[in-house]
Structures are given as C-alpha cells and as structure tokens.
Swiss-Prot record:
One of its GO terms (biological process) is negative regulation of BMP signaling pathway. Residues 187-199 have a biased composition (Low complexity). Keywords: Activator, Developmental protein, Differentiation, DNA-binding, Homeobox, Nucleus, Transcription, Transcription regulation. The keyword Nucleus applies. One of its GO terms (cellular component) is nucleus. Belongs to the POU transcription factor family. Class-5 subfamily. This is POU domain, class 5, transcription factor 1.1. It is found in: Nucleus. Residues 321-380 bind DNA. CDD domains: homeodomain. Residues 227-301 form the POU-specific domain. Gene3D superfamilies: Homeodomain-like (1.10.10.60), lambda repressor-like DNA-binding domains (1.10.260.40). GO terms for molecular function: DNA-binding transcription factor activity, RNA polymerase II-specific; DNA-binding transcription factor binding; RNA polymerase II cis-regulatory region sequence-specific DNA binding; sequence-specific DNA binding; SMAD binding; transcription cis-regulatory region binding.
Amino acid sequence: MYSQQPFPAFAFNAGLMQDPANCHFGGYTGLGHPQPFSFAFSTLKSENGESGVQGMGDCTTPVMPWNSLASFDHQVQMENNQQGNPPRAPSPTLSDSRIKVKEEVVHETDSGEESPEPKYPSPPNPSLYYPNAWTGAPFWQVNPTPGNNINPMPNQTLVKNTSLPGNTTYPTPANQSPNTPVDCVTSSMESSRCSSTNSPNGAINERATTIPNGEMLDGGQSSDNEEEVPSESEMEQFAKDLKHKRVSLGYTQADVGYALGVLYGKMFSQTTICRFESLQLSFKNMCQLKPFLERWVVEAENNDNLQELINREQVIAQTRKRKRRTNIENIVKGTLESYFMKCPKPGAQEMVQIAKELNMDKDVVRVWFCNRRQKGKRQGMPTVEENDGEGYDVAQTMGSPPVGHYALQQVVTPQGYMAAPQIYASAFHKNDLFPQTVPHGMAMGGHIG
C-alpha cells in the first residue's frame, strides 16, 4: 500500500462555500479509491472556545475530512512497530480530547473463589491494518462501550488483552495457545452466563459428577431407574412353581383367591388364578399379580391357620346377599322399545333423562339398551346395526298397495321425528349413502303402476 496525499483545498471568503464540482481528484479518473475532499465552513468554534474563520490565515480549526474511514500514518506506524508498541488506530468519530479508558483487570469469580481455569495468553501483535473504502471498521472496537459488547461463541472465551489498542476485548478460541504470554483473565460475563454452556460435553461431565459412585451403568443409565422386571422365562418358571406348591399344600385356585383377599384385602377370582398358572394373562397383569402370589407362597408355608381363615371367608361370601335380578314391567319395557326405535344408542344425557322419566336407575337403562342392541345383532336386523357408534332411524312401512302411477308408499314415523328420505338404505356408513334415482311411474316398493 502507499500513502495518498489529498489535493489542497481552495481558500474562499467567509461568506462562500466550496463547490464540490470544482474539486479535482489528482488527475485520476478511474474507478479506484477517491481522494478525501473537504468543505470550508464560515465560522467554527475550536475546542478551547476560540472562534476563527476557515480559509483565512488566522484560522485555528483544521478542515474536517469527509472520509468516514480511519486512515493511518505509515511512518508513525512503522516507528511504533520498531519500538515494540502496536499501532494505535485513531477513531474518526472521537475528538483528540476524549477520555482515556483506564485499564482494568476483571477477575473471574465463582462463589467468591478464583476460577481454576488457566489464563490464556493473547495472540501475537497484529500487522498493519489499512481499511478500504468498501470495508468497515476492524473487528476489534476502540474504547468499547457497554452497548458494544462482543458475544462469544460457545467454544470461545472472552480475553482481556492489554497490549491491543484501547484495551479491547475480543473472542479467543479456547484451544488456542499463542507464543506471547500476557496476563489476561476471562471476563465476568463468561462466569455468569457462558461457564455452564461452554461445551455440550461439559454439561454431560457436570451431570455425571453429581451422580454418586456405583450408580452409573453402561450407557449412562442409573440403577435406581431400572426396576427388576422378570423375563418371560422367569415368569413361566414361577407359574409352574406356584401350581406345584399350591397342589402340594392342598389349596385350590379359589382358595388362593380368597387367601389374597383375607391377607391383603384384594380378592381375586378363580378364573384369574387359573389364567395366571396357564400364562393366559397379559405380561403386565402377571407382573402386577406376581408379588401377591409370592407373599402368599411364603404365608402358606409358615402359617398353619391359613386354611381356617380361607374357610371362614368362603362361608361369609356365600351368606352375602347377591343383587336381585332386575325385572322390568311390560309398560316400562314398551316405553324403552319406543325410545330404542327412535335412537338405538342414546348418549349419557339422554339416558339420564330417560331414567328420570321412567323412575329407573341410570345403569339399568344403560344395560337394557346394550342388551337390546346385542339382541338386534343376533336377530340380523339391518336397521339396528352400528357403524362407528351411529345407528339408523327405524321407519315402518305399511303394505297397502299404491294408488295411481306416481303414488308412493306411506311411511309411519315416530312422533316428533321427520320421515326418512325415500332412498335405498344400504349397509354402509350413514354418510356413505347415495340417493337412488327412481324412474317415473315406479314406486319405492318395486311395484309399477
């Protein structure tokens, strides 16, 4: 690179302003870097409060350049570089009387103690930097402000470098080890926000250190979360041992069910014990029932009075009153039939309303409708078939012959309901019905007048 000398500005009177159209660019008309030009202002106030006229001989205020980019003096930079001092980049937006920022060293604190992390040295001094017209300011900022902070990447740490101009703070990779050792510490921002998210492996290691020794298993699983679930072979062997122990002690499957009710308050039927021994229950249900049967085996071997307790429980169960069979009167049954013809599968609110009108229990009404639907299925009634919980309305047709060529059969519908459309009711879903076109002169019953 080379230093460029701008064309000297013209001097005008106090009341005139320089015309930028008259400025020349050193005789160069190419598309290269333009020379910085300046405007002359009439009256400016200096930093010390004295006023002067620009363009005159007694003007004490220099001409303000229009080039917003920083430019370096090559000779001064080379002298500073030979003396060991890094080049200092002047800021175009700050005056010469700006306040120098004091160098401060921020120590990382973690619960009042120094961080065990080693201090990272700064990289070597950078070479000369010449900004171009199409580039902005360098990535380090001179005299950074609180609003101009640099957020580090997850694998970077903020390093306070005292050798760069303006005590700049810049991100440095965590795995970098430059040759020049300089006293530098990490910023407090890292300790408060970035220390826990430095790397995903660090979070795993931190979580692993919190687990006590002996609880970590292969694959990162803990032994506390893993319950002892028996395998299918173990469950099959236990069922065989249970049956052998029960037969050898002289207990029946019903006795085992009664014994579980006496000992643990949970009575099981003979069918459940039989299905467990024949491995006909689901594996989940067998796992839930196995602990009770294991305790029963131990109790049957050690307790001699268990058989007496079982016999007493059987007597109590036989003397316990059973629920009487529900008998519905013929009038009530006819009313339920009429409701069933209107809606074969009523909802919960409809069942409650029917139960209130008939002065019956809701469960009785629910069971009656369920039995009535099953009866219709057994009889093969297509009008009562259910498709996804929906039933078809039932319409009774009278067999009277039609009168005239265009007469239709009379349809008798329940009170308060509209008559069913004159279409062919197929066995498909209710929404899948397609109307059938009827030729003129043909009745719905297939009779031609």
